[in-house]
Amino acid sequence: MEESRSTVKEFWKSLSEKLKESLVSVMPVSAIVLILALTPWVEISGSELITFLIAALLLVLGIGMFNLGADMAMTPMGQYMGQGLTASKRLGVLLSVGFIMGVLITVAEPDLSVLADQVKTVMSGTMLIFTVGLGVGLLLFLGILKILFHIDLSVLLMYLYMALFCVAALLIDSGKGSLLALSFDSGGVTTGPITVPFIMALGVGIALTVGGRGASENSFGLIALCSVGPILAVLFLSLFAKGDLSYTVPGYSFESFLSKATLEVFGAKAGDVGQSLILLVVFFFVIEFIALKLPKVKLIQILFGIVYTFVGLVIFLAAVEMAFMPLGYKIGVQMSAHNPLIIILFAFVIGNVVVLAEPAVHVLNAQVQEITNGEVTKTQMMLALSLGVGVSIGLSVLRVHFGFSLLYYLIPGYLISLGLSFFVPKLYTAIAFDSGGVASGPMTSSFILPLVIGACVTMQGESAVLDFAFGVVAMVAMTPLITIQSLGFKSVMAVKRRSAIAIRRIMEAEDDQIIYFE
């Protein structure tokens, strides 16, 4: 009896801590929207504002429960699988499990289904989903080999991005360049809040079991590689796309969302999240039954964690759809009609704070701080991510205003990112490339993307959305590569400065001991 009371008390303590963290995450976005409602730039009605505030409270609850569930289930599941299968020393089994898991999780990812629905006029949605799943499975297969054989992530990424831009050039040459931005956006879409904690923990489990020098830096990089797979897959599919390449803006009005029954929205999201989780959970318990044989206590903890993850993610996604999508579109349309400079500055500011509300970002930051033993803190990570996302969204709206190709950002951006990777500690490079896939989560696709689409409809017209509005997710995924590696570059410079000062002091001390004879 006393033990059960202690367990309940510990649960409420953990949940309250997670809710406090999520409240701090959601408050900045909510505060900015409330301030914006007082300005003449956006007209937000009383009912819309109340809906938004209710959604914000639901967001706090959803993020808090999701983060608790990730700690209790998603992260341990990945680590146990990584450690158990690696310790068995059956390479074929480990690689096969990695490949199958990559395909299954990606096929079930709700965000990918949304993407497939948006491009079904130009390519088969089913074909897109399974091709992207195959791409992620193959890249996860490659990522596991990278950890096992300590392959340099920088070199691997350099070759992959060279191949990626070669295929992009072929796509432009074929006259289907309008699908380029959509292809790059797919990389951020497929690394969703369910898959990120699991895949990251899988990498940690494998790396810790393999051991050796640089085990901590070797554990990162799986998310980075899995983000490249979907881009390559969609680029290849786009080469064979047929039909009308025009894009129709969905109904983003508050009325279209408020007309749905609340239970209908929650029911739809429960189905999406359940579809994503069930494959992962079944696959884990099959592996557990065959190979892991975990204690009963740990299995019960994982089951409770899965429930918290499910409930938290359903609440989060429903809240986002109810208020954040229509509000983002409305802000984009109305602010850009007033003054393009205002919407560009607003995009930068909102980008700095919206990343705080991404569920998987908190999981990433906690794992980074733990793996690096505090060398890279959660605060440093959050500041670097916030700055990167803010810059990326501001630049995306600037691109919408002037109407130029996404490649003018991506080519120099990735050249800088890959160039920095040869000058900063490998740990920072691995963390940076993983962060790109994590930062571009559901808040980006459900709030920021509608905002940019709204701005594009006003500035360039609906027909230009496919060319200029899409690409914002790709930008959000790219800029953290530069900002986080800049942290590493700063640390390298600081070490060199300290070494130079220490050497100079030693030399000065030796000079003082020299005896001069007349």
What residues fall within each predicted segment?
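Small-residue-rich segments of transmembrane alpha-helices in multi-pass membrane proteins
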Residues: 30-33, 62, 90-98, 159-171, ...
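Membrane-interfacial loop-to-helix junctions in multi-pass transporters
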Residues: 48-53, 85-94, 122-130, 170-175, ...
